[in-house]
Each structure stands twice: as structure tokens, then as C-alpha cells.
Amino acid sequence: MKAPVRVAVTGAAGQIGYALLFRIASGEMLGKDQPVILQLLELPVDKAQAALKGVMMELEDCAFPLLAGMVGTDDAEVAFKDADIALLVGARPRGPGMERKDLLLENAKI
């Protein structure tokens, strides 16, 4: 069996991250013979961290044979440590009255 690939995903509990994680764990992204370790980053906010824990439980419940491990954190250094691939998908949606430049400034913080 191949060595696991470490995949860091930002915004892991968001809509885009959530949709990607199950595809990565099932082998749709890297192949049906490539084990993965998911390193999941979410904002240091109670609601986001609770959602991340829920996503991780769902992934565990699926018992994907290629999912060799998971780390959930709000620390970027932990999430990106030894990562082979990084998917930066966390973002804040545009709110009412926001211009694109406002959105860029807000997402830069993330």
C-alpha cells in the first residue's frame, strides 16, 4: 500500500470544504489506491469548531478505507505541518451591501 498523502483543507466545516472532504476520503481526488490523512483547519470560533467536530465524526462513521487519519484544528501551523497538498477553500460569503473589495479584505483575514 502507498504511504498516505497529507491533505490540508481550510474552511473544512464550510459548504465547499464539507463537499470536498468526502470525495477526498473516498479516493475520488487522488485515486482509489491512495490513502490520505486529512488536516482540517477551521476558524477559532466555538460554532465553527463544533461544526468541524461534527464533520470529523461523519467522516469516521463512513469508515472510508483510504482515510488513514484526521487532525482538526484552529492552528494553521498544525493544519499545514508536513502537508503534501493544501486546498484553501475557506471564505466568507458576500453580505448585503458589500463590494468585492470589502469581501477581499474580509477573506484576507481568514
UniProtKB/Swiss-Prot annotation:
GO terms for biological process: malate metabolic process; tricarboxylic acid cycle. It comes from Stenotrophomonas maltophilia (Pseudomonas maltophilia). Catalyzes the reversible oxidation of malate to oxaloacetate. It holds the Pfam family Ldh_1_N. This is Malate dehydrogenase. Keywords: NAD, Oxidoreductase, Tricarboxylic acid cycle. Belongs to the LDH/MDH superfamily. MDH type 2 family. Gene3D superfamilies: NAD(P)-binding Rossmann-like Domain (3.40.50.720).
